[in-house]
Amino acid sequence: ADRFRKEMPGIQITVEVMNDRPALETSKDSPLVKQIMKTAQMVGISTEDKGHYFYTDASQIIPEISVPFVIAGPGDDALAHCINEHISLESVRRYAKLYQKYLEKYYL
């Protein structure tokens, strides 16, 4: 806004925050994170523990129930929410296998 005020004297700018949700984090030392990463490696998915700068419904749900969570799914971050966003069927299959193996190993 300051740059525009310098370039266009007299301009009026109003900023309204439409959605201000707190960031969420699950420690990389969390059993859930370790289990998901181990299972991903078992099914041939390369893993990286990292944060993301985007909105997820988890920001409304997780604070209410206080459970650890991870975002793990198919797709390329660089293609998310762009005109030609797409996911390969092979990527969907790999992650379906991850979910299946994770449930079998830790819950069945």
Name each region found by the language model.
Residues A1-L108:
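Metal-dependent amide/peptide-bond hydrolase catalytic core
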